[in-house]
């Protein structure tokens, strides 16, 4: 499955199904095959550092040959996003407005959608990071991920609307000149800076949208366990992704019980079979990978090797 993988991959699904383990195993498999891999966690409940027993940050940390890992800190990412916005606004607005800019951003820090917007900026920068053959995202649970991946289209449209209003303002300025009025050069320079900033942001979001919706560039792998609730949530996630034109590469069914484990495990296997029948009725055409329920501790480097062999 993975050796023909797209350059950008997302692993997501219901909380607790093993997204981090599977995404890390995929990264190990590709790195061992000689590919340069960047593994990124966007889940606020980070676990990648625990697997490698390493302290990770927003900067790529080399953990193995061909494998670098990043854990995006939501609070730090939001603070950097707000700092960038403040720098841009201070450069474009008159000095008397600077205290108001600070007040507005302080209020915006905890507003709905701010965290998602900041994470989107970080993802948009990472998907184009040079030097890697594959960039793999270990995502937050389904609902957070669905909202995040729907944002590029919304943000591109929102920025486009701001640019249209900016153009209307510029037309008014040109009309004033035509009537013999004047427009201060500093104002015109600020207008040009605003246009340039909006254009850069729109291009960034459009670039991310183009990558996410290009099946040759990006695939999303849904991780689940063979249980009714994860199956139902995975079907909803599939609908959300495909409605946003994001290709689902596979369903990774994690922790599958053995068929020959005897009388004790037989009821568990029956529950799983029933859940997979439900999955078949909804997503029968999606490629599927089954990963067995392995003995021993799962969140270790040795466990990753065992899982990587099966991907």
Regions found by a protein language model. Name each.
Residues 1-3, 55, 181-184, 188-192, ...:
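C-terminal lobe/tail of nucleotide-utilizing enzymes
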């Amino acid at each position: 499955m993975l050796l023909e993988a797209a350059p950008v991959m997302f692993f997501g699904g219901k909380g607790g199904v093993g997204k981090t383990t599977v995404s890390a195993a995929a990264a190990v498999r590709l790195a061992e095959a000689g590919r340069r891999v960047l593994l990124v966690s966007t889940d606020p409940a980070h676990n990648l550092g625990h697997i490698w027993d390493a302290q990770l940050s927003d900067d790529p940390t080399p953990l193995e040959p061909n494998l670098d890992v990043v854990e995006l800190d939501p609070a730090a990412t939001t603070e950097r996003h707000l700092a960038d916005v403040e720098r841009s606004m201070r450069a474009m607005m008159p000095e008397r407005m600077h205290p108001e800019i600070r007040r507005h951003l302080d209020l915006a820090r905890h507003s709905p959608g701010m965290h998602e917007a900041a994470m989107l900026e970080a993802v948009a920068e990472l998907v184009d990071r040079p030097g890697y053959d594959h960039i793999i995202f270990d995502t937050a649970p389904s609902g957070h991920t669905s909202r995040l991946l729907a944002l590029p289209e919304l943000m591109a449209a929102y920025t486009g609307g701001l640019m249209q209003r900016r153009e209307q303002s510029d037309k008014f300025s040109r009309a004033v000149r035509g009537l013999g009025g004047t427009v201060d050069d500093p104002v015109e320079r600020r207008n040009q800076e605003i246009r340039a900033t909006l254009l850069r942001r729109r291009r960034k979001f459009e670039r991310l949208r183009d990558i996410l919706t290009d099946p040759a560039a990006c695939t999303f792998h849904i991780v689940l366990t063979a249980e009714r609730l994860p199956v139902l949530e995975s079907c909803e996630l599939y609908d959300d992704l495909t409605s946003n034109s994001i290709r689902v590469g596979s369903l990774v069914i994690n922790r599958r019980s053995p068929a020959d484990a005897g009388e004790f495990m037989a009821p568990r296997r029956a529950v799983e079979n029933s859940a997979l029948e439900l999955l078949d009725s909804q997503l029968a055409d999606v490629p599927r990978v089954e990963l067995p329920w392995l003995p021993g501790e799962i969140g270790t480097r040795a466990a990753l090797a065992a899982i990587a062999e099966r991907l």
